[in-house]
Amino acid sequence: MRTEYCGQLRLSHVGQQVTLCGWVNRRRDLGSLIFIDMRDREGIVQVFFDPDRADALKLASELRNEFCIQVTGTVRARDAKNVNADMATGEIEVLASSLTIINRADSLPLDANHVNTEEARLKYRYLDLRRPEMAQRLKTRAKITSLVRRFMDDHGFLDIETPMLTKATPEGARDYLVPSRVHKGKFYALPQSPQLFKQLLMMSGFDRYYQIVKCFRDEDLRADRQPEFTQIDVETSFMTAPQVREVMEALVRHLWLEVKGVDLGDFPVMTFAEAERRYGSDKPDLRNPMELVDVADLLKSVEFAVFAGPANDPKGRVAALRVPGGAQLSRKQIDDYGNFVKIYGAKGLAYIKVNERAKGLDGINSPVAKFLTADIVDAILERTGAQDGDMIFFGADNKKVVADALGALRLKLGKDLSLTDEDKWAPLWVIDFPMFEDDGEGGLTAMHHPFTAPRDMTASELKTAPEEAVANAYDMVINGYEVGGGSVRIHNGEMQQTVFGILGINEQEQREKFGFLLDALKYGTPPHAGLAFGLDRLTMLLTGTDNIRDVIAFPKTTAAACLMTEAPSFANQAALTELGIQVVKKAENN
């Protein structure tokens, strides 16, 4: 039906007769001439109808936005004064000789000239996806997956599919369950990741595996989370953690070079402890120049319990955050930031305004100045590198609250005061995570998942001191987003059972949930390691949006619903009966 795409016409096509198919993006009726911007997935081209082709001109008078049409015409160069430098096709236009209206469009529920609500965009997603910026994002996503497949093929990885209907295993979030009609009362689980299957593939001898795969997690959603999402899933045998990182870093550098024309360079490597200490986050945004600086040793003797308490507590921390140019902040802004850190458990926000650095105590303005000596102020200013016009904010509490509160404040100030370099790419690897963390109920939970191997520990050493264990794990972070994470896996049955025991999984439960894995570990399991990237998150970064729904064709809302199809929906009673399911309604509160 077409010979060319609208958006691909150039001066090289001048004089050629072309047939185009697409939609009316805009129409301008000048009486004797009608101009339309005609759009397809590749872009927009100007088409015009003149009186010499009366039939086509007459039919063109009926055109409205989003009519689906076919046009045949001749490509012409525009006069110099009419060249549109803002359009890829702005040097040419098409003189139409014939027009076919394939399908008309009713009045549109989306307004092309105004910002539509996200609710409307999701309900009429098929119209929203016609917008050039949305089409471009999905084209970029397709390019990314194509680049990934070629790269992985070139590096000897095999694309192997793993099951969608599988067994529920604890991986940190709730499973989506699928009832079995054949096995009444039993349920499959949709995979949160192909974790165990890809490990089993390593045990099967396929030493380099990858898959671009759908995963499902029934969890509370955020702007960068979806109940169903896509992973670039990777596993290798006989490779160390640094070797895995080297290959995966090369993949991501390849993507940025091909999609953005940017060489990311070598990725720095930072330990979890250093990231938390300097940035208050295990996914630091290195575009932001501000860092947390420990000052507890300077404040142990002050007569100000807010500082002295945490400064003398082994589990406490006092840290300072220097904000370049922050002395300009108003009292209201400071109060607003004080309320902001309370969201993260902080009780408030002490500060020092640095007016004249050289004057020390006399050159600052601070509500806590009366508790500080000149020597202490000089030491704080020296350690933080403060300059005239800077602000220093303090966090004083337990270590987690200080990291969370000042880490979040650092990001907010970086954005609010334009301190974060939005034109920069800042990738890094974060390694050496704690293997376990407190579950809040006196037990331990795996920081990543229960199949991650510890670094340099035997099973007996791990059992004796699990809280000291460091995971042989690694996360890739770009501009403050965790885009991928992985680890070296446990390949020894004793170690795996030890980890299960630390997590409170007894032997009977181990057999019920992981018997197949424990059996497989008995038969010459190779050392293996892997990683998974979030394709949606990578695409989000590469297309410059901050909403993951913008890079998924048909996403869910933050309530895990599809507004277009109205999923989820109620099942009919006959289907439920056949599955042996009875729906129990919650009693209404009186």
Swiss-Prot record:
Region (Aspartate): 195-198
Known catalytic reactions: tRNA(Asp) + L-aspartate + ATP = L-aspartyl-tRNA(Asp) + AMP + diphosphate
Matching CDD domains: AspRS_core, EcAspRS_like_N
Pfam families xref list: GAD, tRNA-synt_2, tRNA_anti-codon
PROSITE patterns: AA_TRNA_LIGASE_II
Hydrolase as UniProt keyword: no
Coiled-coil portions: none
GO MF assignments: aspartate-tRNA ligase activity; ATP binding; nucleic acid binding
One BP term from GO: aspartyl-tRNA aminoacylation
Similarity section: Belongs to the class-II aminoacyl-tRNA synthetase family. Type 1 subfamily.
Stated name of the protein: Aspartate--tRNA ligase
Organism listed in the record: Salmonella heidelberg (strain SL476)
Lineage, opening ranks: Bacteria, Pseudomonadati, Pseudomonadota, Gammaproteobacteria, Enterobacterales
